[in-house]
Amino acid sequence: MKKNIHRCAGCGKTVESEKIVIIDNKPICLACMYGQTIPFEIYPIGQVRNELTMKKKDFGLSGPEGISCIDLLPSQKRFMYKLEEEKFLTIVYYLHKTKSVKSIFKRGLDRKEVGVFASRTPHRLSKIGIQDVKLVKIEGTTLHVEGLDAVNGSPVLDIKLKWSDLSQ
């Protein structure tokens, strides 16, 4: 089986597809992006279930807003102790539909030209999304939440109590 090979726009080395990221429509190898840092694995604890999808063009999501379900793996039940007593949570999830990154673009919120770190774009190098949500109810290991902007099928990495709720 033939592997796709790309020439890095940063250093000129040839690398396999799985060892590059596309930034501003140019292949950049992981060595140019991350230097000597050591990659690590993160395992999902569940998955988002809703009707949201990424828009084909422009910015944002498409689909009905409202309640999303977070289907946690059965193994996560033990970590849900007294979760139903909380009103607001922070959901950390993986932006699994992101294909490429633009370093500078017009922000969807106000069309201001900004870099990735000055935005909420899903097109990020880390592919990590974070969203505060309202907990509506829990059924077994399924959380029903309001305000989640993750698309259907997004792997959930972590759930935390919303920070501002700790200070009240």
Please describe what each predicted stretch is:
Residues R49, V133-V136:
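Conserved positions in beta-strands of structured domains
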